[in-house]
Amino acid sequence: MDRKVDVAILGAGTAGLSAMAQVRRAKKSFVLINGGELGTTCARVGCMPSKALIQVAHDLHRREIFDREGIEGGEALSANWPNTMEHVRDLRDILVDRVLANSTDQMGDEFIEGYARFIEPYVLQVGEQKISADRIVLACGTRPVVPPSWADFGERILTSDTVFELEDLPRSIAVVGLGVIGLELGQALSYLGVSVTGFDQQETLAGITDPAARQSAIELMSRSFPIYLGHAVELKEEASQIRVNAGDQSVVVDSVLASMGRRSNLDWLAMENSGVDCDAHGQPIFDRHTMRCGESRVFIAGDISGTDQVLHEATDEGRIAGYNAARDSAVAFKRKTPLAITFTSPNICQIGVAFDDLPADQVEMGEMRLGPVGRALIMGANRGLLRVYAERSTGRLLGATLIAERAEHLAHLLAWCIDERMTVLQMLRKPFYHPSMEEALQGALRDVFPKLNQKSGSADAPPELKALHEPDSSTSV
């Protein structure tokens, strides 16, 4: 059966559902097409089940400091792995059901289950149906990267798509790829009592480019499980287990978690028939402010775009793509300040301009280590550091890298400040409550301020104080 609509949306994940809301709001006819599991990557296999596992793991790990706090019996506590995994799935299912109840469950013939592919520009084949659309939104997501040579190891190779389905946990596991997913799941499994070994071909963790922050993260994460960097891994069968070799290191494990990133599902769409211009890697060339692919009437959104694979960005991209797909001319929208958070202990956060992208001759840096921070000491978490980057000429905050407990909250604060183009002086003049982790940020700002071409209203007054009649122009030079 042939069908004609104003907009066809491929993918019922976060980006696709956000695009659909905009198209529906504009009262355009549409279809939402989805192949595979429903329920968004975040709710089903990403953010939410991982955070459920992390919460249990961190609750259990807290027992490590019970003795010095005068709490007895901590050594007797342990995790019942099958019960833990059932708890994670129960929470996951609640969240997925909420997504479905508010989206595809009530859509009728506007929703089509099946895999779409282009047969010509603006014409899609979905099973026996042919769908013609004036405009198309590509939002069909990604899947974990698993080397083809690992297929022979079968179910012993885990990914973030499969690990939460385990009825029980393996006794030992190698985590290959120490980005956000690998670090979060590796530490959580270690805290739950699994013997974990981590590997990454890169010389960093979680994509950190700031050398001081990178070193701090490596030192602190190595307290949770052994980490080996800088070598590719090779897997070999060894009885019923897997031997993992990387450089001079070798370990035998029950399972391997492949956390080497996610690849786009574009290869399922027959993009060669779409009429969309793609780069050498087959990725559509698009404008990130309109999400429009070249001069076509095709838009792209979410993880499939190859940009930051985080929910708030996927939501925004879906909104932008859906808004523009429902209109004759595309509107360019301002994008949010980059924000990346790894929910390990300590948190690893990167905000604003990345260290490697900073103009070195125009930037000053401030640092605060957590050793003397009172609140961090009380929490038993006074290791790590905060690094902030500011433009020398204006004092404007450009970015930061944080390795600290509860830094997820500081990261939001800094992203908002960068979004508002605030200066270090303006930030120093905000209240910092005692005792709080925010005092660590105050320390980093105090460290960078004297290096900037900024001055307060009175040369001999503390920068935190603003005279009642101080003109605004005195805050920067």
Question: Positions of the model-derived regions?
Answer:
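Flexible, glycine-rich terminal cap/loop adjacent to redox cofactors
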Residues: 8-36, 41, 48, 52-59, ...
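Catalytic nucleophile loop
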Residues: 16, 179-182
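Gly/Ala-rich phosphate-binding loop of Rossmann-like dinucleotide-binding domains
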Residues: 20, 24, 186-191
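FAD-site-proximal beta/loop scaffold in flavoenzymes
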Residues: 154-169, 251-327
